């Protein structure tokens, strides 16, 4: 998913996970999931963020965009919605 390439680019550029740019990516990810798959509530996205690092299948897939991208995306989601 191209959105994760954008997360990776921000991570690699040193942009903070709670910056406006990265938080806009979180909103973009939520809208993408809602448009293409199912209604992605804040609670659902918060859970997905946790799965991005807890489930090795998610982590491996997302980290194809760059090592640490899954962790960065999860951190950004947590910054938006809390733990």
Predicted segment positions?
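Amphipathic alpha-helical "stalk" segments
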Residues: 1-83
């Amino acid at each position: 998913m191209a959105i994760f390439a954008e997360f990776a680019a921000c991570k690699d550029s040193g942009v903070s996970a709670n910056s406006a740019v990265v938080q806009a990516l979180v909103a973009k990810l939520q809208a993408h999931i809602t448009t293409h798959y199912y209604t992605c509530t804040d609670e659902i996205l918060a859970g997905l963020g946790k799965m991005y690092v807890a489930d090795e299948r998610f982590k491996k897939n997302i980290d194809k965009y760059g090592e640490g991208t899954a962790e960065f995306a999860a951190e950004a989601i947590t910054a938006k919605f809390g733990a």
